[in-house]
Amino acid sequence: MTVIGTPLSPVRTRIMLLGSGELGKEVAIEAMRLGAEVVAVDRYAGAPAMQVAHRSHVISMLDADALRRLIAEERPDFVVPEIEAIATDVLEELESDSLTVVPTARAARLTMNREGIRRLAAEELGLRTSPYRFAQTEDEYRRAVEELGMPCVVKPVMSSSGKGQSVVRSADDIADAWTYAQSGGRAGGGRVIVESFVDFDYEITLLTVRHCNGTSFCEPIGHRQEDGDYRQSWQPQPMSAAALEQARHMAQAVTQALGGYGLFGVELFIKGDTVWFSEVSPRPHDTGLVTIASQNLSEFALHVRAVLGLPVPVIRQYGPAASSVILAEGSSARTRFGNLQEALGEPDTSLLLFGKPEVQGRRRMGVALALGETVEQAVEKACRVSDAVKVML
């Protein structure tokens, strides 16, 4: 039986978020709705989840000693990683000493780099993936490109949001793709994955939640990417019954192998009735922001229910819905948003402004959400709303 204590009391149920961006903010809000005490952690002050949490701390989560000390100080009931850049060896060590890591410390370790999860999916579970090679040096990388052929995709094994990712379409791209991958990795360079290009019709995120009563799936989410980062997402993504069955089989296999309770964002490529596994995140997914508008339980509510050992009786999808990203580009610590009256003038629309404290370069600062009669109408409406928001730096 799940028992939730009172925040800021000796009987509190404490959740520590490792990573406090816009996804962590929504997790914090859902956790607080269910009476949990939330401690938000990130590498910079004023991160979105810190703005709503009971307490916050600023540390490098890759600093094993600092992370170990903070967990010992706060004594959380649950540690919930919201990003990949974490000293996962500390989580594995403390999990063996009874700390609850969501979904598991092993899942956090395997998914923090593309090599761990690709080897699990392709080599251990036998899931269909694109042909791939790993390379540590430029010579190994060039051999991998030669073996796989062009076009191929090059990514750092440790990166997110499309950083360091590019497509090699001709021999002229080979050197630049290596250099770009070295600059985009979280560890400052090193190992890359080279993948054959999959000629897919579309790609989806299949949100999969492991909870006390089993495994549940959300309706598939389609999305459009630019420079490796999502710009619009929509739900439901139309797909054949055969493809959906394969997608759910793959999602169940990989999430079962990772174990634990929580929501997973499983990324898949689809061509006709054929499905390829791409990646998985053991946490809410940015493309899943659309579920705030499209479902009775958003991906964040589902994640928190699963973490706390609460049931998920049903996931209701309300019909065509979409999200569209609000981007800022430049340099500022005084970002403001205008023209909101016009942006929110259409029925069945809403905005999330994340509250990120500064912009350096290009940064996702919010998202527009919309419902429509069709997916196409919902996407168009969400884009109109996001385009109407004036970002002032």
UniProtKB/Swiss-Prot annotation:
InterPro entries from the UniProt entry: ATP-grasp, ATP-grasp_carboxylate-amine, ATP_grasp_subdomain_1, PreATP-grasp_dom_sf, PurT, PurT/PurK_preATP-grasp, PurT_C
Binding site for N(1)-(5-phospho-beta-D-ribosyl)glycinamide: 22-23, 82, 286, 356, 363-364
Enzyme Commission number(s) of this protein: 6.3.1.21
A GO molecular function held by the record: ATP binding
Catalytic activity as recorded in UniProt: N(1)-(5-phospho-beta-D-ribosyl)glycinamide + formate + ATP = N(2)-formyl-N(1)-(5-phospho-beta-D-ribosyl)glycinamide + ADP + phosphate + H(+)
Pathway stated in the Swiss-Prot or TrEMBL entry: Purine metabolism; IMP biosynthesis via de novo pathway; N(2)-formyl-N(1)-(5-phospho-D-ribosyl)glycinamide from N(1)-(5-phospho-D-ribosyl)glycinamide (formate route): step 1/1
Tree of life domain: Bacteria
Keyword Metal-binding belongs to the record: yes
Stretches assigned to the ATP-grasp domain: 119-308
Binding of Mg(2+), residues: 267, 279
One annotated GO biological process: 'de novo' IMP biosynthetic process
Residues that coordinate or bind ATP: 114, 155, 160-165, 195-198, 203
Pfam family, one: RS_preATP-grasp-like
Keyword NAD: no
Signal peptide (UniProt feature, chain positions): none
Keywords tagged on the record: ATP-binding, Ligase, Magnesium, Metal-binding, Nucleotide-binding, Purine biosynthesis
One cellular component (GO) term of this entry: cytosol
Record's function text: Involved in the de novo purine biosynthesis. Catalyzes the transfer of formate to 5-phospho-ribosyl-glycinamide (GAR), producing 5-phospho-ribosyl-N-formylglycinamide (FGAR). Formate is provided by PurU via hydrolysis of 10-formyl-tetrahydrofolate.
Similarity field: Belongs to the PurK/PurT family.
SUBUNIT field: Homodimer.
Protein name, per record: Formate-dependent phosphoribosylglycinamide formyltransferase
Species lineage: Bacteria, Pseudomonadati, Thermodesulfobacteriota, Desulfovibrionia, Desulfovibrionales
